[in-house]
């Protein structure tokens, strides 16, 4: 194993004691990008773990199919369209990870990888027919190639321009869909980003990107694929905590991220992930990632003045109390380019805090400076949910669950729907959302 490969292994898998990475964990991550036979634009996930890579790729894939490709029937794409859209999506994520477009891109692949069917590891390491049952998907790795052997044979390929990158990624389509495609792509993103750059962004460099016990991807890994930055947090910008600077998300993401952990008050997702450029959100449970999406672009309309005010106010309220000390009112008003003359600020303090409690409530602040604005969101619109695990789908066939969403500014008991993990996750963005699914059972977050 080369020094570079060892650095990648340490970053991704850590340095597990007692015999290295468990074979069962490596096997779960050893699959390629494979499209469902039932839903031709949906990727399948064979076992728990690699959703940290597959779900972000699926989210970008949907963005490109729904919004960047004219004349494409997103429910029925051809094999050639699958090839084109998957490879353009992988290239896009690699570009996102590259800090400077003048730097090189790196692809991790097999030595002398071919670009035709039956290529890659099968050529140089033939396996007995019995080791690969015919009914096993081609992207699920065999037991023949263990952890050490895999990392001793993979090689790095360097591309200097975006055009070269796109051409190379397209030519390696069979590599991405067969055997270890997910890991090869993940390693490509890591080397393109730069190992030291990732270490500088991760909060705790002793924590590997893949949990050595359960096999789940870390938040840093998810953020790296979604935003190009391997930061460990989901809030907007940087925060100070006990003299330490903790890094968050720096700009609006193309696809979003919402988590059930926020409904449990373990964290709070910032506006840059909660309000992405396209109406596609990765949903996180305690153990799995799925994708919620719609074609309704009104959901991601430019940030309104009141939404901006809410976001800025909350940066001064990091614990999400719903209020700030009145001493910070002037700073908030300055940040929003409101009149901030001392006399006016004092007048607003007395108006917003008539009882002299020394706090300014978020609701009162928004009501005073940004009275109710008409929502551009339609009363109802079609929505879809994707879960790549077969066992989490009806009849164990990976397909989108369709439904209708109602987003209201108040709770209406007349249209109250079941309380499900998917709904609780979405309520972190739309507190009064209701979901009516076309299936008998609601889609699974796990």
Swiss-Prot record:
<dbReference type="GO" id="GO:0071108">
    <property type="term" value="P:protein K48-linked deubiquitination"/>
</dbReference>
<dbReference type="GO" id="GO:0004843">
    <property type="term" value="F:cysteine-type deubiquitinase activity"/>
</dbReference>
<keyword id="KW-0788">Thiol protease</keyword>
<dbReference type="GO" id="GO:0005634">
    <property type="term" value="C:nucleus"/>
</dbReference>
<dbReference type="InterPro" id="IPR039785">
    <property type="entry name" value="MINY3/4"/>
</dbReference>
<dbReference type="InterPro" id="IPR025257">
    <property type="entry name" value="MINDY-3/4_CD"/>
</dbReference>
<keyword id="KW-0378">Hydrolase</keyword>
<keyword id="KW-0053">Apoptosis</keyword>
<dbReference type="GO" id="GO:1990380">
    <property type="term" value="F:K48-linked deubiquitinase activity"/>
</dbReference>
<feature type="region of interest" description="Disordered">
    <location>
        <begin position="117"/>
        <end position="137"/>
    </location>
</feature>
<feature type="compositionally biased region" description="Basic and acidic residues">
    <location>
        <begin position="117"/>
        <end position="128"/>
    </location>
</feature>
<keyword id="KW-0833">Ubl conjugation pathway</keyword>
<dbReference type="Pfam" id="PF13898">
    <property type="entry name" value="MINDY-3_4_CD"/>
</dbReference>
<feature type="active site" description="Proton acceptor">
    <location>
        <position position="288"/>
    </location>
</feature>
<feature type="active site" description="Nucleophile">
    <location>
        <position position="51"/>
    </location>
</feature>
<dbReference type="GO" id="GO:0006508">
    <property type="term" value="P:proteolysis"/>
</dbReference>
<comment type="similarity">
    <text>Belongs to the MINDY deubiquitinase family. FAM188 subfamily.</text>
</comment>
<comment type="function">
    <text>Hydrolase that can remove 'Lys-48'-linked conjugated ubiquitin from proteins.</text>
</comment>
<dbReference type="GO" id="GO:0006915">
    <property type="term" value="P:apoptotic process"/>
</dbReference>
<protein>
    <recommendedName>
        <fullName>Ubiquitin carboxyl-terminal hydrolase MINDY-3</fullName>
        <ecNumber>3.4.19.12</ecNumber>
    </recommendedName>
</protein>
<keyword id="KW-0645">Protease</keyword>
<keyword id="KW-0539">Nucleus</keyword>
<dbReference type="InterPro" id="IPR011992">
    <property type="entry name" value="EF-hand-dom_pair"/>
</dbReference>
């Amino acid at each position: 194993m080369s020094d570079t490969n060892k650095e990648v292994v340490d970053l991704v898998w850590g340095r597990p004691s007692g015999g290295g990475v468990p074979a069962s964990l490596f096997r779960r991550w050893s699959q390629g990008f494979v499209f469902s036979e039932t839903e031709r634009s949906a990727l399948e996930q064979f076992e728990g773990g690699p959703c940290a890579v597959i779900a972000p790729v699926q989210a970008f894939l949907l963005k490109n199919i729904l919004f960047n490709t004219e004349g494409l029937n997103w429910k029925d794409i051809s094999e050639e369209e699958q090839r084109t859209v998957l490879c353009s999506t992988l290239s896009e994520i690699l570009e996102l990870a590259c800090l400077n477009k003048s730097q090189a891109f790196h692809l991790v692949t097999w030595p002398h990888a071919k670009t035709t069917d039956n290529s890659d590891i099968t050529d140089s390491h033939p396996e007995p027919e019995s080791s690969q049952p015919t009914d096993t998907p081609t992207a699920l790795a065999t037991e023949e190639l263990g952890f050490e052997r895999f990392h001793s044979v993979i090689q790095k390929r360097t591309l200097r321009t975006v055009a070269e990158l796109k051409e190379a990624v397209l030519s390696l389509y069979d590599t991405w869909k067969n055997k270890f495609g997910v890991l090869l792509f993940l390693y490509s993103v890591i080397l393109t980003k730069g190992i030291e750059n990732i270490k500088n962004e991760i909060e705790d460099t002793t924590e590997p990107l893949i949990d050595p016990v359960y096999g789940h991807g870390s938040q840093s890994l998810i953020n790296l694929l979604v935003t190009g930055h391997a930061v460990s947090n989901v809030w907007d910008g940087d925060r100070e905590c006990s003299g330490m600077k903790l890094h968050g998300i720096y700009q609006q993401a193309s696809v979003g991220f919402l988590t059930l952990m926020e409904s449990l008050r373990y964290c709070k997702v910032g506006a840059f992930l909660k309000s992405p450029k396209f109406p596609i959100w990765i949903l996180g449970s305690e153990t799995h990632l799925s994708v919620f999406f719609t074609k309704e672009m009104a959901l991601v309309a430019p940030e309104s003045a009141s939404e901006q005010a809410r976001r800025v106010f909350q940066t001064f309220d990091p614990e999400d109390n719903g209020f700030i000390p009145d001493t910070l009112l002037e700073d908030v008003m300055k940040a929003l380019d409101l009149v901030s003359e001392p006399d006016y600020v004092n007048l607003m303090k007395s108006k917003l805090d008539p009882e002299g409690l020394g706090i300014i409530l978020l609701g009162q602040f928004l009501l005073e400076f940004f009275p109710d604005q008409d929502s551009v969101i339609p009363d109802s619109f079609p929505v879809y949910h994707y879960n790549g695990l077969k066992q989490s789908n009806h009849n164990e066939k990976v397909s989108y669950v369709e439904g209708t969403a109602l987003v209201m500014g108040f709770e209406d008991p007349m249209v109250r729907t079941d309380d499900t993990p998917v709904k609780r996750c979405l309520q972190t963005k739309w507190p009064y959302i209701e979901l009516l699914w076309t299936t008998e059972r609601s889609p699974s977050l796990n």
